[in-house]
């Protein structure tokens, strides 16, 4: 009886809570990975420079290609608009397939995370294999998790509700960053290794438990006429066919790409999101540099470390408020407001100058928090694009994972452009080359900055001024570009309501929706 009560409590959890918990099991691993993997291989395993850059180059290519590759392999059977016959998949079966994939790939992600912290091969080979394995499983988990957001709910309100719990659990998962400081020690790596084992075991078991709960919810939808865990918009409890046999005519990759090229809102969205991804990674890459050259004389090293940790947690907490605004005003209006806020704060900081330290500190923190928060809201926009893609091309099932993968393919180059363009602009303006004088550790370091070599007195003001203009002019430029591209995006208001209505009409037997219990 003692075991029955916790089990009954778990089975009674709302679907949105179970779905959101998957973000926790990813976040507790990924934030620690981002902070420490570079420092581990450079400082602990002593990887040489050539092996490091070869690994990063291969990783860059793999990271760009695996999203559309895995999305295509997952969803290509859903693309045909032709009627199909024979044995097929119901909407429930599609969701079950995604949940089953998460049940496999989640524990494998945890296992690949462990492979970073134990030396088992030459450093260069281990670096390459670990990065590719980890990113591959992370991509599979992210694609299916995001695809479920589009498959479990259709209404904007319910998708916002699902995303609310993702942000809540992601914020909780980000606390692993703070805990990691107590264990990180490059000289004695055993305690940090044990900490990572604990995280990996917790994450793997969490994925197994959460996916089992989701699977039971979806299977109960067929047996329970009331569908207590999941509400059926139009007949999920039945077994209507969505996807037929492989003998039916399938769409080719070339035809799918041509359809995307005609999808106007998709093109405007990825143009805007490319700038957003660039800005997010620019902030991540240069956050330690800005702290060092603009604030290090006025704040302690421990304060900088706390600011770095808070910068991982605050966007998730802030996103909870943004999501409440989305329910009231819609995602389009909130995102547009955030772009205007970014532009206004940047112009204010530019006019104030680098000597207003309290305003500067607030701007550095808020710039990262609001930018990261915007990135997290854009997942909701992609789910709307999934709906529009289904309606425009009369698909038998929404190709959610594939569309998320195609968005990633177009926008991930922003990750590469951010450090390249940032270092080039700094060198162009100040003559200071970060590659020749390493003033900061990589963002993956546990410590935001080491003691830098003292620059010549004449250089210091120029470098500080260059960092300041980089800090404010990049957000201004990004905001202007994004306001233009976002103004061309029409999937909001009446058009969005029309798309939602048409999707319901086209797929009355296909759509799951979340019941808030």
Swiss-Prot record:
CDD domains linked to this entry: MFS_MFSD13A (cd17481)
InterPro entries: MFS_trans_sf (IPR036259), TMEM180 (IPR040035)
Keyword Disulfide bond applies: no
PANTHER family according to UniProt: TRANSMEMBRANE PROTEIN 180
Subcellular location: Cell membrane
Protein name: Transmembrane protein 180
Tissue specificity note: Highly expressed in colorectal cancer cell lines but not in the normal colonocytes.
Induction behaviour: Up-regulated under low-oxygen conditions.
Membrane topology field: Multi-pass membrane protein
Disulfide-bonded cysteines: none
Segments crossing the lipid bilayer: 12-43, 56-74, 101-118, 127-151, 156-179, 192-223, 265-292, 306-325, 331-350, 359-393, 403-429, 467-485
SUPFAM superfamilies from the UniProt entry: MFS general substrate transporter
Cytoplasmic side of membrane: 44-55, 119-126, 180-191, 293-305, 351-358, 430-466
Annotated source species: Homo sapiens (Human)
Keywords, ordered alphabetically: Cell membrane, Membrane, Transmembrane, Transmembrane helix
GO CC annotation: plasma membrane
Extracellular side: 1-11, 75-100, 152-155, 224-264, 326-330, 394-402, 486-517
Entries under Pfam families matching the protein: MFS_2 (PF13347)
Keyword Cell membrane tagged: yes
């Amino acid at each position: 009886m003692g075991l029955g009560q916790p089990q009954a409590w778990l089975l009674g959890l709302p679907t949105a809570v179970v779905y959101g918990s998957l973000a926790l099991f990813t976040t507790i691993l990924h934030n620690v990975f981002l902070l420490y993997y570079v420092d581990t291989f450079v400082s602990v395993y002593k990887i040489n420079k050539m092996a490091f850059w070869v690994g990063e180059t291969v990783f860059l290519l793999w990271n760009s290609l695996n999203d559309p590759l895995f999305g295509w392999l997952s969803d290509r059977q859903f693309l045909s608009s032709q009627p199909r016959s024979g044995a097929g998949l119901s909407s429930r079966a599609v969701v079950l397939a995604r949940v089953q994939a998460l049940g496999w790939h989640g524990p494998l992600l945890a296992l690949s995370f462990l492979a970073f912290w134990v030396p088992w091969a030459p450093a260069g080979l281990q670096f390459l294999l670990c990065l590719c394995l980890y990113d591959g499983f992370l991509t599979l988990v992210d694609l299916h998790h995001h695809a479920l957001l589009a498959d479990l709910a259709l209404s904007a309100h319910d998708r916002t509700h699902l995303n609310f719990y993702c942000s809540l659990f992601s914020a909780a998962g980000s606390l692993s960053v703070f805990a990691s400081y107590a264990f990180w020690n490059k000289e004695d790596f055993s305690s940090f290794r044990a900490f990572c084992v604990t995280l990996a075991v917790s994450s793997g078991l969490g994925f197994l438990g959460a996916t089992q709960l989701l699977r039971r919810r979806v299977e109960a939808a067929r047996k329970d006429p009331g569908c207590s865990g999941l509400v059926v918009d139009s007949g999920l409890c039945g077994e209507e066919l969505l996807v037929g046999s492989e003998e039916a005519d399938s769409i080719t990759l070339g035809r799918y790409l041509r359809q995307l090229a005609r999808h106007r809102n998709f093109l405007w969205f990825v143009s805007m999101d490319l700038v957003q991804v660039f800005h997010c990674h620019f902030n991540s890459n240069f956050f330690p540099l800005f702290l060092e050259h603009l604030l290090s004389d006025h704040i302690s090293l421990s304060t900088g470390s706390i600011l770095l940790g808070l910068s991982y947690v605050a966007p998730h907490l802030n996103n909870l408020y943004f999501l409440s605004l989305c329910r009231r005003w819609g995602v389009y209006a909130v995102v547009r407001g955030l772009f205007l806020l970014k532009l206004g704060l940047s112009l204010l900081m530019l006019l104030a100058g680098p000597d207003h330290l309290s305003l500067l500190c607030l701007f550095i923190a808020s710039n990262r928090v609001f930018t990261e928060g915007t990135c997290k809201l854009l997942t909701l926009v992609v789910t709307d694009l999934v709906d529009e893609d289904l309606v425009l091309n009369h698909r038998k099932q929404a190709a959610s994972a594939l569309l998320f993968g195609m968005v990633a393919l177009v926008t991930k180059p922003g990750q590469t452009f951010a450090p390249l363009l940032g270092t080039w602009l700094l060198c162009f303006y100040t003559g200071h080359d970060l590659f020749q004088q390493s003033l900061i550790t990589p963002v993956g370091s546990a410590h935001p900055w080491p003691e830098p070599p003292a620059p010549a007195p004449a250089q210091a003001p120029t470098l500080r001024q260059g960092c300041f203009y980089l800090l404010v002019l990049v957000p201004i430029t990004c905001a202007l570009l994004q306001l233009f591209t976002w103004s061309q995006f029409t999937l909001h208001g009446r058009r969005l309501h029309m798309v939602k209505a048409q999707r319901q009409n086209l797929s009355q037997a296909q759509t799951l929706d979340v019941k808030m219990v």
